Structure formats: C-alpha cells, structure tokens
C-alpha cells in the first residue's frame, strides 16, 4: 500500500516502514560518528525501547557501546492493508541493523507492567545473555493494570490545587489558543503516580535481582523532565510532576539495593524537552518546543533524543565525573535551562500570535520532527512507492 500521514489531534495514526527505518539509521549514524564509549555497558535491558528516549538509549547502547540489547515494548503489528505503529517499525529496523553488526538484539512485545512480561524477560535474559549490566526504564503510558491487585490506574495531565489557563498551540489548525484545565482530583493524582511513578521500576529491579539476572555492579536509570517556569504548572507542579517526584523517592531505595549488589547504582536522569509521542500530548509543549527550537538552534545548542541520550551515556552514566545535581540526579538538560535560553523563550512566549507564529518560533522545525517520529518527511524515502505494511520483527517474543 501507499502510506500517507493521517493526523488526529496530537497523534499520527499511520506510520511509514521505510521512513521509520531511515529515522533509526539517522540516529545510528550520529552515534557511530561520535565514537565508542569504551567503559559502556555490554548487556542492556531497555524497558520502553521502541520510540523516543527509550529507542535512543537502545541505539546508544548498541552502536555507542557495542552492547547486546533486549527491548521491551507494547506495539501493534501491521496488516496487509493497515500500517503498524511507528515503534514496531523502529524496532524492526533497529533489530535488523544491530543484528547485521553482529549484536544480539531481541525484543518482547507486551505489557511491561505485567508480571508475565517480567517473567518472560527474566527467562530470556537467563537463556540468551546470562545477566544484564544496565537497565533503562523509559515507559510512558496512559494506563496501568496493577499486577498484584488488578486495579486499573489512569494517568492524567492536569494542574494541582487550582484551575490553569495557559497559552497553547493547536497544531492541527496552527493557531495560538488558550488552554484551560481543571485541577486533578486526589484520585487522579494517585492514578498518575501509580502509572508514571517509580513503583513499576522498583518491581522490575527487585524481580531481576531476585532472579539473579542483574550483573554485579549493574546500573539502572529512569528518565524525567524538570523544565522551567513556563512548563511547571502543567508538568513539575502538576499530576505528572507528582509521579516524577515519586521516581526521585523510590530511586533512593533502588540505589541502596544495587549498591549492596556489587557496588551498582540507580539514578534518575533529567533530559531536555524534545518532540516525542508523549510530549506532543502535553498542552503547553508544542508552543514551548517551537520557541525552544528557535532559540537553541540560533545558539547552536539544539539537541534531539539521540544527542541527549548519547551525551547522557558518555558524560554521566559511564563517566568518572558525572554531571549530577544536589539531589543526585544525572543532568543532561543543562543547555535547555541556561538562563539566556529560558529568558529569551519567556520573553517571546506572550508575544506569539497566529500572524507571527512562523517568524517568532520554529514551528516548522517542530512539525518536521513530529512527522519524523512516524517515518514521514525523511530525505531519500519515496513516499509514493508501494510498501508492505506487514514488516516482521524476526527475534520477537509476542506476549
């Protein structure tokens, strides 16, 4: 079939296999050009491995550290006349390219929150890798079924304490709008923490440790975002922020557990705002990112997922002098938070109108990166060609 982009709200409901492969290849080329991280991990588990920061971590591990990788994700396969999700095509491309390099690259497709997927992951590590020395936790999901109680929790993006009206960008209509959000209820906050907090990360590490498949001295990291004033009401001070604060609490227990296991370590890693399927759903983010791109590109400091994560591996995760803050978090977001960047974004924020949107912001760049997530708009791809949407992932365990 000929696959074209079909956008509904903040999501593109189609994805292009050749375009997704080109996007993965582009990220691999970047990592390869940077050179090897000699002290890096050798056997890596990435939970949430198919898109965004999780995919970038898998690429950085394989092509930056020559590591064997096992990826866990929840994606939909393609059919004869229906495209797969972008994450499916990304993972198929990654596996093909990593295998061609002589690396182990297997995947498990299923609900990472479930005990069954944890058990299958443990079996696979035991059988194929023996042990893993790095666990990257990069899940973003709208809901979670608790594996012990069966209770279903939903995650929400809402302010806390009072209603919020803020500027936003309607990406469909390309207009500046006011976005009003009611505050989250106690139940919604609890649900968001249950989905996006640190409990599942802790469950993964406990299960891997108990099964004996975590190498001595193993490291683990989960990703977070702090941001600055513009995003604080909806993000850090909102329902999602409560979940991220839960990560900060739970990492202390995980760190102690791993420290006792051959001097291992656990860190929350703070990454910059980027265009991902998750971030495009956050009301202020498209406008904030469009402004941030403009300012950071002018300063020559713009970075996407792969630049951020490769930098995190090289400068912090596998560096004797990591970039850490006073709470012990690893920081890769410092270029975004430079006062001159934030001051400029804050000054431009209230002045953007429908008329000057493309002059004051890099909305064009935002749209381009958004389309790239789904494999569209990449150079060298023939989008008028007939392609088979049913791409197989060879080394896949389907749960």
Curated annotation (Swiss-Prot):
GO terms for molecular function: enoyl-[acyl-carrier-protein] reductase (NADH) activity; NAD binding; trans-2-enoyl-CoA reductase (NADH) activity. The active site is at 235 (proton donor). It is an enzyme of class 1 (oxidoreductase). Pathway: Lipid metabolism; fatty acid biosynthesis. Signal peptide: none annotated. Belongs to the TER reductase family. This is Enoyl-[acyl-carrier-protein] reductase [NADH].
């Amino acid at each position: 079939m000929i696959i074209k982009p079909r956008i509904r709200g903040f999501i593109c409901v189609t994805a292009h296999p050749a375009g997704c492969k080109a996007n993965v290849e582009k990220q691999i080329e970047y990592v390869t050009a940077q050179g090897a991280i000699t002290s890096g991990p050798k056997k890596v588990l990435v939970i949430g491995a198919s898109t965004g920061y999780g995919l970038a971590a898998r690429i950085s591990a394989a092509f930056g550290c020559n590591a064997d990788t096992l990826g866990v994700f929840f994606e939909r396969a393609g059919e004869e006349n229906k495209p797969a999700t972008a994450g499916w095509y990304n993972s198929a491309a990654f596996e093909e390219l990593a295998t061609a390099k002589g690396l182990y690259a297997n995947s498990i497709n299923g609900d990472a929150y479930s005990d069954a997927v944890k058990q299958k992951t443990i079996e696979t590590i035991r059988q194929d890798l023996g042990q893993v020395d790095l666990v990257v936790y990069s899940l973003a999901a709208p809901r979670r079924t608790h594996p012990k109680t069966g209770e279903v929790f939903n995650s929400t993006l809402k302010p806390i304490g009072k209603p919020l009206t803020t500027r936003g960008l309607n990406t469909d209509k390309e207009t500046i709008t006011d976005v009003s959000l009611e505050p989250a209820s106690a139940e919604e906050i609890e649900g968001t923490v249950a989905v996006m907090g640190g409990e599942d990360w802790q469950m993964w590490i406990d299960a891997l440790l108990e099964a004996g498949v975590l190498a001595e001295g193993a490291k683990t990291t989960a990703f977070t975002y702090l941001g600055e004033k513009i995003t604080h009401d909806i993000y850090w001070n909102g329902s999602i922020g409560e979940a991220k604060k839960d990560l900060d609490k739970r990492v202390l227990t995980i760190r102690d557990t791993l420290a006792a296991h051959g001097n291992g370590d656990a860190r929350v890693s703070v990454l910059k705002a980027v265009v991902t399927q998750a971030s495009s759903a956050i009301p202020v983010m498209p406008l904030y990112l469009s402004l941030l791109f403009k300012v950071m590109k002018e300063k020559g400091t713009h970075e996407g997922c792969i630049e951020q994560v490769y930098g995190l591996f090289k400068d912090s995760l596998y560096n004797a002098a990591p970039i850490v803050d006073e709470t012990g978090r690893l920081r890769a977001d410092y270029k975004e938070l430079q006062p001159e960047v934030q001051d400029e974004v804050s000054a431009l924020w209230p002045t953007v109108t429908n008329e000057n949107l493309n002059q004051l912001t890099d909305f064009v760049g935002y749209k381009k990166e958004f389309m790239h997530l789904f494999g569209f708009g990449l150079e060298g791809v023939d989008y008028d060609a007939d392609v088979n949407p049913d791409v197989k992932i060879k080394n896949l365990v389907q749960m």
